[in-house]
């Protein structure tokens, strides 16, 4: 196992900080070990990126695109290796990590089109000369990646940032360093010029050193709202720096007037329990009518949830849920469940830590109707679904909006009129009808309002924050106007 895990100025370096490791949360074994980057190595990474900016930005778009497309080819050639690496570090089943690598490949075509359509050249005629809108890169940007999609989500920042002409210092989650290392190795094989993409590994202190670096022109972050808020406060008073945040959610899913109970339960489970509930778009609150249909949906949901297969990511018979990211994350979900029970909630399906030394938990359902007004507005990042029974549709929408977040929301209903009513009143950046709320098109804006973030990270609209527009009025030679303003004589 190599100790050279920091990629700076085109070379791999051993860390100068403290010992760090990555643990497979399913197999409970160490799969990566190194030393974190020191503050001096963070400085070196930023300096390396700064030195590369002029040459990289001066490349034509086609030249930059060629490197990115070569990376895409290498992804395709190494898709099985990368899917297994993601599974080992996150615990996610291989069927799911394979789709993550596929999304990484798909991001390249989306980002190419986005650059041309959203930040390409626009020319407008004028009576004298021409008006142009062009775009320039910010310069040096930091990319902070999350652990739940350690390949796809950082890639959604990195690809459009490189296409726009930025140079990057990438700080991945300390829980998924091996995915980052192997991804950057593919970028290296793609032939990126030295300094264009740098990698620093570490924990909180490494992230703080990078985020606070005075020579950054921007920071692109995907992760928790708590960390995102700290970054937002840190960047206050620095209007010259671009800050793109994609954060958490406390997402509502409302069900009313459906005809197919099994289809409804399927979409609820996909919304709440896919990725062991570790998607920022996962449904956290399920609103069911307080009537016989609501009772039937809940009974079927409980039945199917109890039979969800949880298991190893590489099992021949693939599970729906793998392990959570760590044993600590699993324990935190048990504690969150207990907190809600102490506040007056009722357990319908107990979330259980199946192996205290692993990340395996069973999915849980808890009825919070009796204490919904006192329920903490927290993002419980795991497979725990909170059920609220309602009599009034507008009341359910109001409770769904009663959050500082605003990422995703959905309605399961056979009535389009109800959906239009819901759509006009719900507050979220992603609003779905009769589809799981964890699903979003890579060609559509991805993000939310409130404490779910700003900008629209990791999708087609990422091009917007990777470059800034420049307006120009241009004429081939200096020309004296035919009509002079009053008071001028030539």
Swiss-Prot record:
Gene3D superfamilies: Aldehyde Dehydrogenase, Chain A, domain 1, Aldehyde Dehydrogenase, Chain A, domain 2. NAD(+) binds at residues 223-228. The active site is at 246, 280. It is an enzyme of class 1 (oxidoreductase). GO terms for biological process: arginine catabolic process to glutamate; arginine catabolic process to succinate. GO terms for molecular function: succinylglutamate-semialdehyde dehydrogenase activity. It comes from the Bacteria. It catalyses: N-succinyl-L-glutamate 5-semialdehyde + NAD(+) + H2O = N-succinyl-L-glutamate + NADH + 2 H(+). Keywords: Arginine metabolism, NAD, Oxidoreductase. Catalyzes the NAD-dependent reduction of succinylglutamate semialdehyde into succinylglutamate. NCBIfam families: arg_catab_astD (TIGR03240), PRK09457.1 (NF006992). Belongs to the aldehyde dehydrogenase family. AstD subfamily. This is N-succinylglutamate 5-semialdehyde dehydrogenase. It comes from Pseudoalteromonas atlantica (strain T6c / ATCC BAA-1087). The lineage of its organism: Bacteria, Pseudomonadati, Pseudomonadota, Gammaproteobacteria, Alteromonadales.
